[in-house]
């Protein structure tokens, strides 16, 4: 279990520490804190990082994992996977100007972070096809949308900590809810006590009938936590 979680393009981070060999950074993200390979992140000043993370207009990825279009001109952003719930601002580009050698007429022009040769933060445009599953804002938090978003992952391989380009149970529910603007912690232990959720604890004093009554009150999209695992009620 070397890999515990995942970061996504555009995630703002605090770099808190560096390894002795300089190959790793200990970072704090909105969802998790862990060691990350230094080559996987770009370092910039606080104002620039936070401005990009909050800038509008933007697109929210509402599909499971759409990709940007292929381009030889900018291989760092060619067919880049963007996972559900990722929020990327639109680039301030002229609507008819070529982007990476392609006309942007049928695509959204995203302003994505890139890592320069010296490890510093930069930005470059990339095209996301308009047919891809994205939205101009977070989806409304409804039970119907929770089901629609959840089933977009149907058939995907399970991946502990987002290994195998998949996701585990807590990553799954985190990204479903994130597409509706609800930010949950990364792991089940923290999710189960998150103030973002209306929590009902089942303790040892409750008998079977009491537990059954609570189960019957559950609605679509509600989350059930047991040690090390989370499940979503679908009806």
Model-derived segments and spans:
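Loop/turn positions that initiate beta-strands
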Residues: 8-13, 82-91, 218-224
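Boundary regions of SH3-family modules and the immediately adjacent low-complexity/disordered segments
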Residues: 1-9, 28-67, 72-73, 84, ...
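Short, conserved secondary-structure segments in the cores of folded domains
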Residues: 2-3, 76-78, 214
């Amino acid at each position: 279990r070397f890999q515990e979680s995942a970061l996504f393009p555009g995630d703002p981070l605090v770099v808190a520490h560096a390894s002795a060999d300089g190959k790793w950074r200990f970072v704090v993200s909105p969802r998790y804190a862990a060691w990350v390979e230094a080559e996987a992140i770009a370092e910039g000043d606080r104002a620039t990082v936070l401005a990009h993370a909050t800038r509008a207009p933007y697109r929210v990825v509402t599909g499971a994992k759409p990709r940007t279009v292929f381009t030889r001109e900018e291989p760092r952003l060619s067919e880049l996977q963007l996972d559900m719930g990722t929020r990327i601002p639109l680039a301030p580009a002229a609507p008819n100007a070529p982007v990476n050698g392609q006309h942007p007429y049928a695509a959204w022009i995203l302003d994505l972070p890139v890592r320069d040769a010296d490890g510093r933060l930069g930005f470059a445009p990339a095209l996301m096809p308009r047919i891809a599953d994205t939205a101009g804002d977070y989806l409304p938090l409804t039970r119907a949308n929770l089901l629609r978003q959840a089933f977009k992952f149907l058939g995907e391989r399970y991946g502990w900590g987002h290994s195998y380009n998949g996701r585990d149970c807590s990553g799954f529910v985190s990204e479903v809810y994130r597409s509706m603007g609800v930010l949950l912690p990364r792991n089940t232990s923290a999710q189960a006590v998150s103030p973002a959720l209306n929590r009902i604890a089942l303790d040892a004093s409750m008998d079977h009938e009491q537990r059954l009554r609570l189960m019957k009150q559950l609605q679509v999209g509600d989350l059930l936590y047991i040690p090390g695992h989370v499940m979503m009620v679908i009806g």
